[in-house]
UniProtKB/Swiss-Prot annotation:
InterPro entries documented for this protein: Bact_CellWall_Synth/Modif, Beta-lactam-related, Beta-lactam/transpept-like
Cell membrane found in the keyword field: yes
Gene name in the database record: flp
Membrane topology: Multi-pass membrane protein
Something else known: Has two of three conserved motifs typically found in penicillin-binding proteins (PBPs) and beta-lactamases, but no penicillin-binding activity has been detected.
Name this protein carries in UniProt: Protein flp
Membrane is among the record's keywords: yes
Cell location: Cell membrane
Protein role: Its precise function is unknown. Has no penicillin-binding activity and is not involved in methicillin resistance.
Organism: Staphylococcus aureus (strain NCTC 8325 / PS 47)
Keywords: Cell membrane, Membrane, Transmembrane, Transmembrane helix
Pfam families referenced in this protein's UniProt entry, alphabetically: Beta-lactamase
Amino acid sequence: MTTKKLYFLSISIIILVAISIAIYITLNSNTKTRLTNDSQQQIDTIIEHDLQKGHIPGASILIVKNGKVFLNKGYGYQDVDKKVKASPTTKYEIASNTKAFTGLAILKLAQEGRLNLNDAVSKHVPHFKMNYNGQNETITIKQLLAQTSGIPSDITSEDSVTSKNNRLNDVTHAIMGDELHHKPGEEFEYSNMNYDLLGLIIQNVTKQSYTKYITNSWLKPLHMTHTSFKQTNYKSKHDAIGYELQGSTPVVSKPEFNLWDTPSAYMMTSTEDLEHWIKFQLNPPDKYKSLVQQSHKNLSSTIGEPNANAYASGWFTNNDEHLVFHSGTLDNFSSFILLNPKQNYGIVVLANLNSEYVPKLVEHLNTQIVNHKRYSTVASMLNQYKDQFNIVTVLMTTLILLAFIFSAYRAWQMRHGQILLRRSKRIAVLSWLSLCICIALALILYALPYLILGSNNWSFVLTWLPIEIKLALITTLIALFSTLIVILLFLHTKITKT
């Protein structure tokens, strides 16, 4: 067989391999699908994969779509030592997801005429004063909501908090007269202190404690009867134990905390209770519709914040994808709430570990929900073609073995002087062309999740793909580059005449 024929035969094999994989993955009928047991299994697989990767002891996860609960389930343990499993009733510290309650309460008080968003903070918090470049500056309630007050994110230290000043009323004493990072209203800077001050304003305007007002005005009407606010490190029956990682091992953690951070960080709740909150946010009663919509409106631009265009009243927003969301992190807990009012669904992940895998999990679940019809159809189709993928795996494995045998034989021939290297411009061009074709096909393979499923994340796709498809993909990729090696050996070597 001539070199030219061998070259085109090898290229044909590569193209046919790539096309066969593309055909198997892209076969997609017009059959309408809905969320089925297979979809539930896919979601469970995604969740368990991310929790395992993040070494998260326990989590409770809620998905609400079109006013109905699709998923409300616990995974792992709320208490590892006692083997108490996480459940929808497990209570977690939700950290900064407390801010949305505080923001909504402020907007409600403004709607009732009990305060104005353009009021100076000092109007409701007597003697409040902060400086910029040595000059006293006026900060408004709206600037606190928008995180544009200029108050630094690191303005207080845990070391400065004692049992004597660890109350919401003491928050102003900790920062009184301190220097702002920038002039109020000019720049976004995320700071818990903004929402702590809003909590104090709520307290002063309503003449009742912040926690009592939130409970009576929002929690009870929404039937969030098991939601509370952290007061001590004592854990009741349904409270999750918080953990921190030591290496890859979660260990019990009970960090110190500030009571004055209650309005910004220390609500304790469950997915069972948050079901009511999510439904309220997505489909509020008529009397609250304008209020909820206002709480989702952009107040400030958040340049530099990942995946966010702006900050609203206790929420980040992404206008491009119509998302309203917020993460919450403490030393030993993390949470993430995502809303898509346009498509009418919400996702909640509560975990008893501070982990970067919590927002990753929400991203994966969001992708799954947005594309669930496509995923369900593709997954169903792939399951029907498992035998064919097994055949592909066998063929690709055979091709890899043949390529290995040929390469080893060529190496043996070279060692014994039976092979000579040849060089020419034509061979160089063909070599570069072969390499470019292989790279192009590899890039197409890499882009398949985005082209077919709307996700550019292979790690996400691989969590729910059947093992037969995974093996077919892996062996195909190896076969692709094995074939390239064979092509290059054909082009650059020739058998010596004896």
